[in-house]
């Protein structure tokens, strides 16, 4: 009897209960109880079932393995995991050889991407067809957002195609799409992006729908249609490319037939009656290019152009130059070697200061072309003599006349020089009835030369002398020769030559603070550097020319730190092409005192140096003023203080210029507090007075702006804002006390799958704008928050 039972059991259904783990046909199996039918080549598993095969780990309450067909039937709390994905369901039929199957009442999860449905067909390693499906990339439950559809065909690492898609926020249905394609990978891929909603005073409500085109591995584009309720339909393009690891470029273009601009008061003020209130086509082009070439040269291009002068104010985030006096368009090729610099450069400018937004550009002066060749300081043979030279050739050109017909008006002690016009008014451009007048004859006493060619050559020789440790003396001599060619009769060629002698003395005192015993301790080096420089022109010759004004050549009051301002136009020394046309520091002593603090700290096993503190005080004394005539005697220059502090949580960069004879201080100062989280607070001051030697300062005409910026970062909310306060608002006849402002709020609901960005801003003199954008994380990779620099793009 015992023998009969033994034979019967072991020929029908062998029992492995005594051995709960086994390996069959490359499959590792473990369960509370396991039965195998060798004839049918099946195995019945029950209780804490675990199956491992080719990187897949399968768990269930019960399973039936079909060894002949390489399939497994799983029941109850089924979970299939591999290195990338997890499959969970009530019941699963799996072809473990081909990695296909059917999942009932389950879901598939890859990272934070989850698909769930009543029936999920696994058609490949990462391909699924889901019925009565839900899709989300949120990590929370219930999910912040999801798409439900009758059918979803998904390829993990590719796309999901959803039929009858319904967007839900939480359980609430929001929008229905008949068909939707969403990306399931973080790689660049073509597809529609989420729409953006905007509203502005002039444009009205607007909705834009962008399409991202992944052209190749090194180029892509965003094509966008934006429909304004008041302006009309606008097309936008942004094309980006990379040419090599260090070379890239981008092209931005936009165009619309603007109906709202047709009613603009400024535009219609200058238009003929027959054209008033007619819509016009508006556009912009912005292009940036940087290319490192095989010969070691660098090709750069910067193009910024718009159809009208008001475009940057109406669309400040497109041209990115609202408030600038000119649009600069520049193309250059530069090549630097160990001791030389060579460049070919061309700059085309668009004058943005006209009253008429459709004004021409004939009065703008361009630099086309400009050639530079410089040789850096290098020893002469084996001696201590060092030489250097600079050569600059530039052609100044424009579409209009070679000179400006000018006239003057005097009121009290103030003389104003301005273009001759039919109204004889310095503010003639504000009146559309006023026109410029050209009499066809150059008047050297008042007219202004605007075009010509300049060749500038300057060799220099130095002889550094080390008197002691930390004490250096550097005598220098340079010769400068400049040739001008003007398109003006009787004033066609001008030459200027001079010698400059300089003597610089510098003392460096330093001390190291901190732990000097440990080799990897943090240390600080404090340097105090007093220095004195004397500059003199022992020989100077210059041809008489109205280009340099009517004042005495030897009395020109320029120093190297004086900038060109509008006040120069009416001065006795006129205004030239640029700063290089000035002769400065004729007999000048400059004294400076510099303090520097440098930190040395160790990052891992590598030393890191950074300058954490810098303070420089400088002032000059012009000895040549003693020999000048006139009633103005102001030999001391402004006292300049430059402060630069860069700590982990505190930064400031400030420049102060105190003018002793006017008793006022120009300031440009920024103070910033921040932490490691990304939160910050910043205050910036810009204060500028118009300084005229010998005259009192009109404080009511000053520019004094305070800019306040702050940023707050938290788990669910990011906030940052900025506004500019005009401290001189009460003394102005027009303008707002708050000149411009912007704030950005980013809401981050739970689940790391959605950014809701709200932007509210107003540029100086422009519209109030609202912008709302939803940034969904379809691929499961959370989006980074906007950096604080984003505020700078809103046309302050």
Please report, for each region that a protein language model flagged, where it lies by residue.
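A generic structural signal for solvent-exposed, polar alpha-helical segments
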Residues: 10-12, 16, 151, 718
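Outer-membrane beta-barrel proteins and related beta-barrel translocases across Gram-negative bacteria
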Residues: 91-93, 100, 108-129, 133-135, ...
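Bacterial N-terminal signal peptides
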Residues: 1-12
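N-terminal amphipathic/hydrophobic interface segments
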Residues: 17-132, 146-149, 153-154, 159-164, ...
């Amino acid at each position: 009897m015992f023998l009969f039972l033994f034979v019967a059991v072991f020929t029908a259904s062998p029992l492995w209960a005594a051995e709960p783990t086994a390996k069959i046909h490359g499959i590792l199996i473990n369960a509370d109880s396991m039965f195998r039918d060798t004839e049918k080549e099946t195995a019945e598993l029950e209780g804490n079932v675990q199956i491992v095969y080719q990187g897949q780990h399968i768990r269930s309450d019960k399973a039936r393995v079909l060894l002949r067909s390489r399939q497994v039937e799983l029941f109850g709390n089924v979970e299939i995991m591999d290195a990338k994905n997890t499959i969970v369901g009530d019941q699963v039929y799996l072809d473990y050889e081909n990695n296909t199957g059917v999942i009932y009442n389950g879901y598939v999860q890859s990272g934070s991407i989850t698909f769930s449905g009543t029936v999920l067909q696994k058609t490949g390693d990462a391909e699924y067809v889901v019925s009565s499906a839900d899709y989300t990339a949120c990590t929370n439950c219930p999910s912040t957002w999801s798409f439900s559809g009758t059918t979803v065909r998904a390829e993990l690492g590719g796309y999901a195609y959803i039929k009858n898609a319904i967007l839900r926020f939480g359980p609430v249905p929001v929008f229905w799409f008949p068909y939707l394609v969403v990306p399931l990978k973080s790689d660049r891929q073509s597809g529609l992006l989420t729409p953006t909603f905007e509203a502005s005073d002039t444009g009205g409500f607007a909705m834009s729908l962008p399409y991202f085109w992944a052209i190749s591995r090194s180029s892509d584009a965003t094509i966008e249609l934006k429909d304004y309720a008041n302006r009309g339909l606008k097309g936008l393009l942004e094309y980006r490319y990379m040419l090599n690891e260090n070379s890239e470029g981008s092209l931005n273009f936009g165009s619309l037939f603007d109906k709202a601009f047709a009613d603009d008061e400024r535009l219609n003020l200058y238009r003929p009656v027959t054209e008033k209130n007619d819509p016009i086509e508006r556009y912009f082009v912005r292009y940036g290019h940087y290319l490192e070439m095989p010969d070691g040269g660098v090709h750069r291009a910067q193009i910024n152009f718009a159809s009208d002068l008001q475009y940057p104010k109406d669309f400040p985030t497109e041209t990115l130059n609202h408030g600038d006096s000119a649009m600069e368009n520049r193309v250059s090729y530069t090549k630097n070697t160990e001791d030389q610099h060579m460049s070919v450069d061309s700059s085309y400018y668009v004058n943005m200061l006209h009253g008429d937004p459709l004004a021409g550009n004939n009065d703008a002066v361009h630099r086309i072309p400009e050639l530079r060749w410089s040789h850096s300081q290098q020893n002469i043979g084996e001696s201590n003599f060092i030489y250097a030279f600079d050569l600059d050739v530039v052609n100044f050109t424009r579409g209009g006349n070679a000179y400006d017909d000018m006239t003057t008006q005097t009121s009290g002690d103030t003389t104003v020089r301005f273009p001759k016009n039919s109204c004889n008014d310095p503010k003639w451009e504000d009146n559309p009835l006023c026109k410029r007048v050209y009499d066809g004859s150059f008047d050297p006493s008042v007219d202004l030369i605007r075009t010509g060619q300049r060749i500038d050559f300057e060799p220099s020789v130095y002889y550094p002398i080390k008197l002691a440790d930390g004490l250096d003396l550097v005598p220098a001599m340079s010769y400068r020769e400049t040739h001008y060619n003007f398109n003006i009769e009787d004033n066609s060629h001008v030459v200027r030559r001079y010698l400059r002698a300089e003597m610089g003395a510098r003392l460096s005192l330093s001390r190291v603070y901190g732990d000097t015993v440990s080799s990897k301790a943090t240390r600080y080096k404090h340097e105090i550097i007093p220095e004195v420089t004397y500059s003199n022109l022992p020989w100077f010759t210059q041809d008489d020319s109205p280009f340099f004004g009517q004042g005495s050549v030897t009395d020109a009051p320029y120093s190297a730190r004086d900038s060109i301002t509008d006040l120069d136009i009416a001065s006795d020394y006129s205004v030239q092409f640029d700063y290089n046309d000035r002769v400065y520091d004729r007999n000048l002593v400059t004294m400076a005192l510099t303090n520097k603090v440098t930190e040395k700290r160790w990052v891992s096993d590598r030393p890191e140096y950074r300058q954490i503190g810098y303070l420089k005080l400088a002032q000059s004394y012009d000895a040549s003023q003693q020999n000048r005539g006139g009633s103005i005697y102001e030999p001391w220059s402004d006292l300049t203080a430059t402060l630069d502090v860069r700590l982990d949580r505190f930064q400031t960069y400030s420049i102060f210029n105190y003018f002793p004879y006017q008793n006022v201080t120009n300031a440009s100062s920024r103070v910033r507090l921040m932490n490691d989280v990304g939160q910050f607070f910043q205050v910036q001051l810009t204060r500028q007075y118009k300084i005229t030697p010998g005259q009192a300062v009109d404080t009511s005409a000053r520019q004094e702006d305070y800019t306040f910026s702050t940023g707050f970062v938290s788990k669910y909310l990011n906030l940052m804002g900025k506004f500019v306060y005009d401290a001189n608002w009460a003394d102005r006849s027009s303008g707002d006390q708050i000149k411009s402002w912007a704030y950005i709020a980013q809401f981050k609901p739970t689940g790391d799958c959605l950014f809701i960005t709200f932007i509210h801003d107003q540029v100086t003199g422009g519209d109030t704008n609202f912008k709302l954008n939803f940034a969904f994380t379809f691929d499961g990779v959370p989006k980074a928050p906007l950096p604080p620099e984003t505020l700078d793009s809103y046309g302050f």
